[in-house]
C-alpha cells in the first residue's frame, strides 16, 4: 500500500482550454487521457508472447480478481513499470475536487501513490502551452513537499 501524496494543480489561462482540462479530470482515467499507456493486452513481451487474461470469481459468481499472465505464468507487470517511469506514480489519481475559481483559473486536487505525477503534468504543459500551471504536492509519510 502506498503513501498517499496530495497534489494541487492550478491552471491559469483561456477559459475554453481550462474547460478541456476540467473534462479530462472528470473522467475515470485522466492520466491515461493526458499521457496514454500502451495497450499491454496487444503488446508482445520480449519473447513475443501476448498476456492471457486470468480471472477468479467469488462463490456468487461475481468477479473477485483479474490479471494478465504470460504463458510461462509470469504476471504481466509492464503497466506498473511504465507508469512509474512515465507518470512518476503507480496508477490513476484519486480526484478529490475540481474547482473553477474564476473564469481564468481552475484548481484540481487529487491523491497519487507515493509521489507527484510530474510526467503527466509535463505532458499536460506540452498539450496546453498557452496555459500556466502551478503544482504543489505534499507526501506526509516521508515528509516531502514542494512545487514543480
Indicate where each model-derived feature is located.
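Long, contiguous binding/interaction regions
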Residues: 1-148
Amino acid at each position: 500500500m502506498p503513501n498517499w501524496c496530495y497534489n494541487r494543480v492550478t491552471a491559469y489561462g483561456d477559459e475554453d482550454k481550462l474547460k478541456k482540462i476540467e473534462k479530462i479530470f472528470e473522467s475515470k482515467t485522466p492520466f491515461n487521457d493526458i499521457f496514454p499507456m500502451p495497450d499491454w493486452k496487444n503488446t508482445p513481451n520480449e519473447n513475443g508472447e501476448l498476456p492471457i487474461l486470468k480471472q477468479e470469481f467469488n462463490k456468487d459468481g461475481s468477479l473477485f480478481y483479474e490479471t494478465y499472465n504470460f504463458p510461462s505464468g509470469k504476471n504481466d507487470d509492464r503497466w506498473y513499470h511504465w507508469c512509474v517511469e512515465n507518470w512518476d506514480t503507480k496508477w490513476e489519481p484519486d480526484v478529490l475536487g475540481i474547482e473553477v475559481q474564476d473564469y481564468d483559473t481552475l484548481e484540481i486536487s487529487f491523491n497519487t501513490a507515493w509521489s507527484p505525477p510530474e510526467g503527466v503534468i509535463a505532458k499536460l504543459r506540452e498539450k496546453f502551452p498557452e496555459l500556466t500551471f502551478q503544482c504543489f504536492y505534499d507526501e506526509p509519510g516521508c515528509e516531502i513537499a514542494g512545487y514543480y
